[in-house]
Amino acid sequence: MDFIEHLLPELLDKILSYLTEKELVTFSKCCVKWREITNKDTLWLHHCMRRGWLRFGLNGDINRETHLNVKMSNIGGNSPVFQLYVPEETRLSPVCKWKNIFIRVHHLNKNWRKGRYSVSPLLKGHAEKVTALACNGKYIVSGSEDKSLRMWDMAQATCIKKLDGHLDTITKIIWKGNTLITGCADSSIRVIDSTNFTLLFSLQGHSGSVDHMTLVGKVLVSAATDRTLRMWYLPDRRLVNIFRGHTDDIECMYSHGTHVVTGSWDKTLILWDIEHAEQFHMYSGHNEVVTCCYFDGEKIVSGSGDNDLRIWRISPPGCSHILQGHEGEVYCLAANHHVIASGSSDSTVRIWNYNGKCQHVLQGHLGIVRCLHICEERLVSGGDQKKVIVWDYKKGVQMNIVHRHPSLLHLMWVNETKLITASPERPGTVAVLSYW
């Protein structure tokens, strides 16, 4: 006798909601009927939500994620490719959306954890080193010291568009919808249609290299070596404000909501209120250049050439914690709601909590740690000697080393399935690693 037949559907759903995903799978193997009972979006949505995986079905659908089509290097048959076998003739209904997402994300995270990835052929075409990168998940746009802008099809590993016209090194790229915005060492900002790679208009006003940009709604905020920030209202191509406050070159920028933080060689940070077009506060305390910064709307985190990180209060303004431990300059940082990760010239990555305590010291790099990316599941660090490492930052342990990274790197872009880096060497190359 099947006891399930005697349970009200609401009670059965309630009972099943207490099962773990492994228990659900075991339950579903008993018979076709039990498999159908567990093949419900409500059950698997719960497990995706509990693990923080809703973004895979809401912000983007991993069920539509495709594999790269080009012939890729895959040593040892350690393929990351996902294949869900479904018999051609079956009595079973199709796997429901959120169960499919759960299975795929579990496979994806296992790829990152086990080091299962494929390496695309190097993207070659730039005559000089690549100095700027942007990606929308399907295409890559790169800028170079050779003054050209290129678009690459990741699936085919080919350059599909090229734009000349910049008069100097391309320093920064923002990609928003069908619009590309480039900052250039020729002091200009260019707005480009990404669909046909044509120049829409340019913005003139800076008197130095435009090295940093961020979008705040329809307002573009740019920072240049002329030590100013400028606000541009893009719909009517208008300069709406000029901010002055730093007394030396601006080294880093980070935005959140309607506020922008900048760090400078003058050893200070400034929080700017873009909505009200004013300087909110200047933060002083570092003894060397502020190399990197982060802002979440409530607090600022900064790293410096003085080897320290600092956490700053917004209200009342001031330094709440000094994070000491690195034995070399702090080159980069990445943060989320739980922790701060910092990379240094001392070859280590440190994990800190927001009370200023160092939780883990991650060792494995040789030379400077130049790039960091953090998400809920992992931390990725890139540094000298072609070395990229994937960490479980919660436990403070190394998941794997990307042994087949093909080139040196100084820029890194990471999403859920791809790892993209640019080399500081000439001629410029871009490397693509796929974990899917």
Regions found by a protein language model. Give the residues of each.
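Solenoidal tandem-repeat scaffolds enriched in leucines and small polar residues
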Residues: 207-209, 213-312, 321
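Conserved strand-to-loop turn within each blade of WD40 beta-propeller repeats
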Residues: 143-146, 183-186, 223-226, 263-266, ...
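Intrinsically disordered, low-complexity acidic/Ser/Thr/Pro-rich linker and tail segments
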Residues: 1-5, 22, 28-29, 33-151, ...
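WD40-repeat beta-propellers
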Residues: 149-153, 173, 189-193, 213, ...
